[in-house]
From Swiss-Prot:
SUPFAM superfamilies: 6-phosphogluconate dehydrogenase C-terminal domain-like, NAD(P)-binding Rossmann-fold domains. Sn-glycerol 3-phosphate binds at residues 105, 136, 138, 191, 244, 254-256. The gene is gpsA. This is Glycerol-3-phosphate dehydrogenase [NAD(P)+]. It catalyses: sn-glycerol 3-phosphate + NAD(+) = dihydroxyacetone phosphate + NADH + H(+); sn-glycerol 3-phosphate + NADP(+) = dihydroxyacetone phosphate + NADPH + H(+).
């Protein structure tokens, strides 16, 4: 089996490494010449994962057509804000009747489209039943280190979901399939917003009580907007919901939590982003999530406060104070 992976960041590389580890021939799309040379000659992604040796069956190419054309499966893992442009470029030579697996997380700025809506808008209908979406608690470095990991595979086609499930499942990588595309996407996108808040809390020196509160109320917000969009509430108790939320809010490898932590320590967003090698999706997603909550008429207190902190320069200490001063609520209802 020949597989093309679009995106050479840490997660795309990790998924490509997993698939190559299973014996598949994997071609990774990279824009950077030195990165391509490093992967092909030394089997190291020198830009994103310099400490890990990649399988020999994983190679890299700058030619997007070469990566995509004639492959038996496509894995798409670019930042969500770059997805529309990439799909418009590849659709003329995208193979038909092969699984297309998206691992991108986010809500498109401006259009407020989920990743699945971008795929279904940009690709002809003949591709739609072959689309699937991978999400769950999975740091790239730990996948490469072969740490036992679980994720969700969502597709509106059970045939596609089960096929992708079989292709990805391995000794250290277990997959669960679900038809709930919306739930998997909402959980995978909005957990990054909550992780920013959790990072701020840690940066301000608050304890684990506060982090647990943010995770709990954050899950409430994710579930509310998910239900409004038609998701199955049980999805948010699975790998792509609670699982990913806990990992992203607590794990030291979380880029979004790290951005929040540094904001809590007093750095500006501009200072933080200037030194980052990878995208923290939660920054752009916060804007889209805020606008979507306003459009749908849903109260999302944590999301609103993170938005004010990122885009209106609100002091992180004031964010926490205002969250704690909110009107008292009844537990057990999505409010």
């Amino acid at each position: 089996m020949k597989i093309g992976v679009i995106g050479s960041g840490s997660f795309g590389t990790a998924l490509g490494s997993l698939l190559a580890d299973k014996g598949y021939e994997v071609t990774l799309w990279c824009r950077n010449d030195s990165q391509i040379e490093s992967i092909n000659r030394n089997h190291i992604n020198n830009k994103h994962l310099p400490d890990f040796t990649l399988p020999e069956k994983l190679t890299a190419s700058k030619d997007l057509r070469t990566v995509v054309q004639g492959k038996d499966m496509i894995v798409s893992s670019p930042p969500s804000h770059a997805l529309t442009e990439i799909l418009r470029e590849i659709k003329e030579y995208l193979p038909e009747k092969v699984p297309i697996v998206s691992a991108s997380k986010g809500i498109e700025n401006g259009t407020l489209r989920l990743v699945s809506e971008i795929f279904e808008s940009e690709l002809p209908g003949k591709y739609h039943s072959y689309l699937s979406y991978l999400s769950g608690p999975s740091f790239a470095k730990e996948i490469i280190q072969k740490v036992p990991t679980i994720v969700s595979i969502a597709s509106r086609s059970e045939t596609t979901a089960r096929k992708v499930q079989e292709i990805f499942s391995f000794l250290y990588f277990r997959t669960y399939w679900t038809p709930d595309v919306i739930g998997v996407e909402v959980g995978g996108s909005l957990k990054n917003v909550i992780a920013l808040a959790a990072g701020v809390s840690d940066g301000l020196g608050f304890g684990q009580n506060t982090r647990a509160a943010l995770i709990t109320r954050g899950l409430n917000e994710i579930t509310k907007i998910g239900l409004k969009l038609g998701a199955d509430p049980m999805t948010f108790l699975g790998p792509s919901g609670m699982g990913d939320l806990i990992l992203t809010c607590c794990g030291g490898q979380s880029r979004n939590r790290t951005v929040g932590f540094r904001l809590g320590k007093g750095e500006t967003l501009e200072q933080i982003l200037s030194g980052m090698n990878e995208v923290a999706e939660g920054i752009k997603t916060t804007q889209s999530a805020y606008e979507l909550s306003q459009k749908l008429g849903i109260e999302m207190a944590i999301t609103n406060e993170v938005y004010k902190m990122l885009y209106e320069d609100k002091n992180p200490k004031e964010v926490v104070k205002d969250l704690m001063k909110r009107d008292l609520k009844r537990e057990g209802v999505l409010v």
